[in-house]
Amino acid sequence: MKKFIFYTIQLFLAACFMAACSGDEPSPAPEPEPTPNPEQPGRKRTILVYAIASNNLVSDFYDDSEEMLDGMKQIDPEEYSLLVYRVFRSGDVALLEATSTDAGMDFTIIKEYDNQTLSTDPRRLTEVIEDAMELRPAQSYGLFFWAHGSSWEPEYSEHTPLPLNQAQPPMLYAYGGDQTTGVSDWMDIDEMASALPDNTFDFIWFDNCFMSSIEVIYQLRNKANFMVAYPTEIYSYGAPYESVIPLVMKPDADLIEAAKETFNFYNFQRLACTVAVMDLSKIEAVSDACEKANSNFTLVKTLDLQKYSRFSYGPYFDFVQLTKRIGAKSPDFDETELDRAMADFVIYKACSAKNFSGKEIDPENYSGISAHAYKVYTTHDEYYRSLDWYKRIMNGQ
């Protein structure tokens, strides 16, 4: 309303000025109408699903592909493009597009790739993103990572294919699980960060286990406006794409409603599920509070903290609960400052009553984000100390 009144006054004064000067000079010619920018992409949004299905998730990929097509049925493919990069164990690697055919929605191949480069190689990720943006340019972009995930922990892979008789089945580290050439290969999150262009995606959605960790989120903070991820495991069925795609395939993606659909899908079945939506533009206020919490860092007891991992992963604890325990020994730390920052940063979060181990999740201590217990020495600590999050909040300790 204030803007309207301001412009109304401006127009009135301009009219009075022109009337007063009309006897001196002729009125200026009207400004020509702006012409459309021929460089403006015709599509409103292109969403890329980067799917590594060359592993035990292949049957889930087929199911999710059908869901994605169902989600695109009411969407104009001339204005909104859904692209899926997928790799199978057979070595069949291609970029597909959801298109309208005489038989209904289906995927058609728009580019094929060689299978000598693993899909967990950051060079392939960069190549596919560049292809997607060149082949289907749009005014905005979204990105789904579809595969296995395990937070920040590295594999240290050189992404070199090995003969089948040399394949070693490692733990699921970071992102991927490409078994195209016999070795189960993974992409570390610093590699992922180097492969992703800055300030390109409206959102990144990790449809993988454990990727809602502060280490992953902070490493990718400059890659998108928003992020959706799960601090715990997620069932291999993943997101209900028939509901999610229509909500995110529009100029203003409704990520909160899409996350709610995902949570409700599992919660109604009384299955474990956690999810969070983050506004990445608000993350530095969180890191400021955490830097203060760690200014007088000492190891803390973690046995009674809420834990989101199981088996040999992590352990990954609730981020806020861990930070407050560490910060209790720092005179610079203010819990209220952290709570305010988190309220702006995590714009939606939800958790089921129990986790995947059958233990209750305390909603009062559920932040939607996990964290590593800093300086609990493991074989991966050297790598952990190289991550942006550690450097940001530990003051070089």
Go through each PLM region and give its residues.
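Short, solvent-exposed loop/turn elements at domain surfaces
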Residues: 55-59, 92-93, 378-383
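Catalytic-core segments of thiol-dependent peptidases
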Residues: 86-109, 117-198, 208-209, 214-215, ...
